[in-house]
Amino acid sequence: MELKVLNTAGAETGEVVTLRDDIFGAEVSEHAIWLDVKSILANKRQGTHKSKTRAEVRGGGRKPYRQKGTGNARQGSTRSPLMIGGGTIFGPTPHGYDQKVNRKVKQLARRSAFSAKAQEGRILIVEDFALAEIKTKPVADMLRNLGLDAKKILMLTPDYNMVIARSGRNIEALNIMTAEKASTYDILNSHTVLFQKTALKKLEETLG
């Protein structure tokens, strides 16, 4: 597959980049994608949820009323799970949600995600650019020129660039990261993947 390289003004530069078939033209493995995305979302969970049992709730040491003669059901504590303010039966307890996915499956999932985007025509290549100062306007103008200003965009750079990263972080629909760090979830959670030209080489090195 070949794609034309665009400049930040949205015009063609005359240069054409060939995308590797094993990354952008592979058969999409939905199962690998499912495994990887499921593990990514699960690993984001803190797992610190906790509710108190009747033994942990403060108070309740005194019997609320006498055993007999009131007409009420017998109660030994105001912190019984049956009463307001009481403990919780079988409530949530802290535990980890981590799920391990083999490296080969992760690689297959990323290749499948990029291939799916390529099949949908949602991959763009822009020439490498640099910003002199941290400013949102140049990045916003570039997205507008490329027709991406109203869409959720994943922009991949070859290396971490603090100026570009900070210039784009005020744009809610834009997610900027290095090509090697883009996960399957990041790719699929965007409408279009926007590559800086040299970021393609970094991605090829990462995926082998």
UniProtKB/Swiss-Prot annotation:
Segment Disordered: which positions? 45-83
Any one GO molecular-function label of the UniProt entry? rRNA binding
Q: Which residues, if any, are the signal sequence?
A: none
- One GO cellular component term: ribosome
Q: Which Gene3D superfamilies match?
A: 3.40.1370.10
What SUPFAM superfamilies has UniProt attached to this entry?
Ribosomal protein L4
Q: Which segments show compositional bias classed as Polar residues?
A: 69-80
Q: Which domain of life is it from?
A: Bacteria
- Give the GO terms filed under biological process for this record: translation
Record's keyword terms, sorted: Ribonucleoprotein, Ribosomal protein, RNA-binding, rRNA-binding
Protein role: One of the primary rRNA binding proteins, this protein initially binds near the 5'-end of the 23S rRNA. It is important during the early stages of 50S assembly. It makes multiple contacts with different domains of the 23S rRNA in the assembled 50S subunit and ribosome.
> Quaternary form?
Part of the 50S ribosomal subunit.
Q: Which NCBIfam families match?
A: rplD_bact
Query: Which protein family is it in?
Result: Belongs to the universal ribosomal protein uL4 family.
The UniProt entry, under PANTHER family, shows: 50S RIBOSOMAL PROTEIN L4, LARGE RIBOSOMAL SUBUNIT PROTEIN UL4M
Q: What is the official name of this protein in its record?
A: Large ribosomal subunit protein uL4
Q: What is the lineage of its organism?
A: Bacteria, Pseudomonadati, Chlorobiota, Chlorobiia, Chlorobiales
Q: Which gene encodes it?
A: rplD
